[in-house]
Amino acid sequence: MATTALLIPCYNAERYLPNLKKQIEALNPKFDEVILVDDGSTDRTVERGRELGLTIEPLGVNRGPGAARNASVKRCRAEWIHFLDADDEIAPSYLKKVLPLTNAGVDVVLCACEDIDEQTRKKLMHWDYPDELWQKEPIRGAIQRGVVTYASFIRKAKFDEIGGFNEERRCWEDGDMHLRLALAGARFRAVPDVLCTSIRHARGTSGNRLYCHRCRLGFLQEYAKFSPPIDARDLIGEVMQTAAGLYQEGDFSAVDEALNLALRLGWKGPDSGHAGIKILNYLPFPWLKKMAFLKQRERRNRQ
């Protein structure tokens, strides 16, 4: 039987620790290792953990989620790892559902997940990862369906092979890690069950939409260097989605940066229904001239 580890980075998580302890105790079967690390909290996270009987190792200065998760991996010996944030929730049957797929030909097992509002418990997002897509086209899946951290059960050796999480950016580092797994040849499977839930509130980094859009653009600029094996059309679609988000947040210089990236990838201008059409009416005049030129050139090429 494969050995397993539940890895939990904590940052100002004092209020969530009682529920986290209940989540851990309810697991059946249980993980072989449960490792909690504190990423420079300014509240009583470490002390409250001790009061509850949870061992939380302080890491010192706050370095962000990617660095904290990488630190937790270095402290475990298990063959398979699952990341959970201190304010996340995990189904008691988690291991029962994912362990049957951990054979010699698999490196990552995904599960469906949900995001819910902390106050209302209303479902905000459903993350679904079709097994067939992830078996056949994991790179496309990772670009089009960014995988959240709590969705995956990962072979530690494969995680170590890619160098773990990016520690420079504090948003989209989870989607980036899973894409790099796919690019490294990791073999994926997925179960349809909702096994993990993320509690959403305004205090986390993901609540800063502008910062997250900028992180996504930074990652996409890096991925443009890997086309192929990443399909340029998939990248263009993600770039335009990001450009639309940046426009909504008012970062017009980043919008310009995103559109230039799309052009370098071969974008010919937005079609009806394309994400880019949402921002076309708001582009400055030089961009409108550029779009008109592209359309004219495309028509000439067809003649």
Regions found by a protein language model. Give the residues of each.
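A conserved acidic beta->alpha catalytic loop
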Residues: 38-46, 61, 85
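Short, flexible, basic/aromatic active-site loop/helix in glycosyltransferases
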Residues: 112, 126-145, 149
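Short aromatic/hydrophobic "clamp" motif used to bind/position activated sugar donors
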Residues: 81
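Glycine-rich, basic loop-to-helix element that forms the pyrophosphate-binding segment
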Residues: 59-76
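Conserved donor NDP-sugar-binding/catalytic core segment of glycosyltransferases
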Residues: 93-124
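Acidic donor-binding loop at a coil-to-helix junction in glycosyltransferase catalytic cores
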Residues: 170-179
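Short, well-formed alpha-helical segments that are part of the catalytic scaffolds
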Residues: 12-26
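Catalytic core of nucleotide-sugar-dependent glycosyltransferases
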Residues: 186, 194-202, 206-233, 253-265
